[in-house]
């Protein structure tokens, strides 16, 4: 009965032009409101939103500093660009590294020279710069300093890549960030992608690896292979590690140029001590050769810490003297360095594990 009361012409008649426009307008408004509402909700629940905004501001600032303003970057490239280091702001040069003259000379010949003198090597594929360089050896021996000095002296853009930058909770985002690393480096070439503690990121693959991590590593290596096929590409991936045995064999294949940065010998320790104490107030009677002989097994960072302890002894004597007859801190003496050596040896021989085991846990 109800259907009979509805005029059939109102059901079958076509919509008018104004009605169609009105319907499309309402659908457009509804779609826009739905889109922005969902986008706002996703941004609201994203715990990294604030960090992403700050990273974008930092990236834009760094891009202006290095003189790159007309290059368009994607959202993912902006996230990676936040880890750019301006070569002009890096204070590290070859003169700040002592005891590694042979490594520095080989780096200059095999990595820097083929890029700075490209016109001399254009006709040879064998003389092209390597796409992967590995610095390995004990901690505190100058691996990171060498990487920064290489970028500084060669004028490369330096991307200090943190593995945590490539991790994202959304599926597929890590792969996009990995791709952005290489696309950004190519846009900014010549450039160095430096990965410190590379073994924590590209270690041996196993069946227990998470699916997202395995996919990210696979894509990273695939993009890396793309650098090898493009002989005009001026992008170098440089890694540093204390545990080269933990690196995946596929990664080692992609890093054919390797430098072993070992603990310094007596001559190298003397050179390092000269560099550390070069601008310090030191007595002329100090025998650095003797100090170098007594510091067997010390790394470069150990020697710096030892010299700092010796300098602090001079400060303590000045502060605690009963009748301050002098208003200046005395120079570093031989006995100050001897005491600092003994302190460093005790801390090195104590053993961190043994010290922690003596701490009560309840």
Swiss-Prot record:
SMART domains per record: AAA (SM00382)
Name this protein carries in UniProt: Outer mitochondrial transmembrane helix translocase
One example of a Gene Ontology biological process annotation: anatomical structure morphogenesis
GO cellular component terms attached to this protein's record: mitochondrial outer membrane; peroxisomal membrane; postsynaptic membrane
Keywords: ATP-binding, Cell membrane, Membrane, Mitochondrion, Mitochondrion outer membrane, Nucleotide-binding, Peroxisome, Postsynaptic cell membrane, Synapse, Translocase, Transmembrane, Transmembrane helix
Any Pfam family: AAA
Subcellular location(s) per record: Mitochondrion outer membrane; Peroxisome membrane; Postsynaptic cell membrane
Transmembrane domains' residue ranges: 20-42
Organism: Danio rerio (Zebrafish)
Function: Outer mitochondrial translocase required to remove mislocalized tail-anchored transmembrane proteins on mitochondria. Specifically recognizes and binds tail-anchored transmembrane proteins: acts as a dislocase that mediates the ATP-dependent extraction of mistargeted tail-anchored transmembrane proteins from the mitochondrion outer membrane. Also plays a critical role in regulating the surface expression of AMPA receptors (AMPAR), thereby regulating synaptic plasticity and learning and memory.
Keyword Cytoplasm: no
Chain sites annotated for binding ATP: 137-144
Gene Ontology MF annotations: ATP binding; ATP hydrolysis activity; membrane protein dislocase activity
Cytoplasmic side: 43-362
């Amino acid at each position: 009965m109800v259907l009979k009361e509805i005029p059939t012409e109102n059901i079958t008649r076509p919509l008018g032009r104004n009605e169609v426009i009105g319907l499309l307008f309402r659908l457009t408004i509804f779609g826009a409101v739905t889109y922005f509402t969902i986008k706002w909700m996703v941004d609201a629940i994203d715990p990294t939103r604030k960090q992403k905004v700050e990273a974008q501001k930092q990236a834009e600032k760094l891009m202006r500093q290095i003189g790159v303003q007309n290059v368009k970057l994607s959202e993912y490239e902006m996230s990676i660009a936040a880890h750019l280091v301006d070569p002009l702001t890096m204070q590290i040069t070859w003169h700040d590294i002592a005891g590694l003259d042979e490594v520095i000379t080989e780096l200059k010949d095999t990595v820097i020279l083929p890029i700075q003198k490209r016109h001399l090597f254009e006709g040879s594929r064998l003389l092209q710069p390597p796409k992967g360089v590995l610095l390995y050896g004990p901690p505190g021996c100058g691996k990171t300093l060498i990487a920064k000095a290489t970028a500084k002296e060669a004028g490369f853009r330096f991307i200090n890549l943190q593995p945590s930058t490539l991790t994202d909770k959304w599926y597929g985002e890590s792969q996009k960030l990995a791709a952005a690393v290489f696309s950004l480096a190519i846009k900014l070439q010549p450039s160095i992608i430096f990965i410190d503690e590379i073994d924590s990121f590209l270690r041996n693959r196993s069946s227990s690896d998470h699916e997202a991590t395995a996919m990210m590593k696979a894509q990273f290596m695939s993009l890396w292979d793309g650098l090898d096929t493009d002989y005009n590409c001026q992008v170098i991936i440089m890694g540093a590690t204390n545990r080269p045995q933990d690196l995946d064999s596929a990664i080692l294949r992609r890093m054919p140029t390797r430098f072993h940065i070992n603990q310094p010998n007596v001559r190298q320790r003397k050179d390092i001590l000269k560099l550390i104490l070069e601008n310090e107030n030191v007595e002329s009677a100090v025998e650095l050769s003797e100090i170098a002989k007594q510091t067997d097994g010390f790394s470069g960072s150990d020697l710096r810490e030892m010299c700092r302890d010796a300098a602090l002894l001079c400060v303590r004597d000045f502060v605690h003297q009963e009748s301050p007859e002098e208003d200046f801190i005395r120079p570093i003496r031989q006995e100050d360095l001897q005491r600092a050596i003994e302190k460093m040896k005790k801390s090195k021989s104590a053993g961190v594990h043994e010290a922690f085991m003596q701490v009560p846990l309840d």
